[in-house]
């Protein structure tokens, strides 16, 4: 037991526990299962395709979870942590029934929001240091993973051969300002009348009037989040196409020179 504790504290102090361009998620599912799923998808993603249930892409609802502490069945976000240490602590708490689980190392991207930065003093669990991924995390965005056996993190980082650095190398999580409109506080929540959210309140939220179509605060937040996600997905698709076109151009140039 002393050896396990010693190893644990060495890992806590090591550089692999903090990396500004990487995030971490503890998950019971092995890499091959994550790959078959297309990545780390939100629970609401499966509900949407299986039952047609609309995903709830409300950050405040996501951060609160359910009254029992579990993930919402219609959740449109995937939780990650800022550090390996935070992910490990989360794993030891929520995955304590598993002798083996994994901590996935994930590249940052603009569909991710620092929950504490966006929700401020109204963040329900600030100690979790959570960064939430709107719409999920593709398998190509997963840099690699650590195995955790009986609470001890394997020192070896298993690299994901399908990670695409060129798609994500220059991407960061979204600035807090981008997330204020998507915070998802209830319509009459006092945050909408306070800094900084008062300047970003969607129509129908706080003192803002409803939209011309009569959308409620929650509906407008859902619409704005959907638009934000689609813009991000389009950006990544353009990057993928651009890289593919560059490779084709290089191939054609080499072929012409031969």
From Swiss-Prot:
Domain of life: Bacteria
Residue sites binding NAD(+) per the record: 25-39
Transmembrane segments: none
A Gene Ontology term for the protein's cellular component: extracellular space
Catalytic residues of the enzyme: 128
Molecular function per GO: toxin activity
InterPro entries found in the cross-reference section: Enterotoxin_A (IPR001144)
SUPFAM superfamilies given in the database record: ADP-ribosylation
Keywords noted in UniProt: Disulfide bond, Enterotoxin, Plasmid, Signal, Toxin, Virulence
Signal peptide stretch: 1-18
Subunit comment: Heterohexamer of one A chain and of five B chains.
Described purpose of this protein according to its UniProt entry: The biological activity of the toxin is produced by the A chain, which activates intracellular adenyl cyclase.
Similarity section: Belongs to the enterotoxin A family.
This protein's name: Heat-labile enterotoxin A chain
Species this chain originates from: Escherichia coli O78:H11 (strain H10407 / ETEC)
């Amino acid at each position: 037991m002393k050896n396990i504790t010693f190893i644990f504290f060495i890992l806590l102090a090591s550089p692999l526990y903090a990396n500004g361009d990487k995030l971490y998620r503890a998950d019971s599912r092995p890499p091959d299962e994550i790959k078959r799923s297309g990545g780390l998808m939100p629970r609401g993603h499966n509900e949407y395709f299986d039952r047609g249930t609309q995903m709830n892409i409300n950050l405040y609802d996501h951060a609160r979870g359910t009254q029992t502490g579990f993930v919402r069945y219609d959740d449109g976000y995937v939780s990650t942590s800022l550090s390996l240490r935070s992910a490990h602590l989360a794993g030891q708490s929520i995955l304590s029934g598993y002798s083996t689980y994994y901590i996935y190392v994930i590249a940052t991207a603009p569909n991710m929001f620092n929950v504490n930065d966006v929700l401020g003093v109204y963040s329900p669990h600030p100690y979790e240091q959570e960064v939430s991924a709107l719409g999920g995390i593709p398998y190509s965005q997963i840099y690699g993973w650590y195995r955790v056996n009986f609470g001890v993190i394997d020192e070896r980082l298993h690299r994901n051969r399908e990670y695409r650095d060129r798609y994500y190398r220059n991407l960061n999580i979204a600035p807090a300002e981008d997330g204020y409109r998507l915070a998802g506080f209830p319509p009459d929540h006092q945050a909408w009348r306070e800094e900084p959210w008062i300047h970003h309140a969607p129509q129908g939220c706080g003192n803002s009037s409803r939209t011309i179509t009569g959308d409620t605060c929650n509906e407008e937040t859902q619409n704005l989040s959907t638009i934000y996600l689609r813009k991000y997905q389009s950006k990544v698709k353009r990057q993928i196409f651009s890289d593919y076109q560059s490779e084709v151009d290089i191939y054609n140039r080499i072929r012409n020179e031969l």
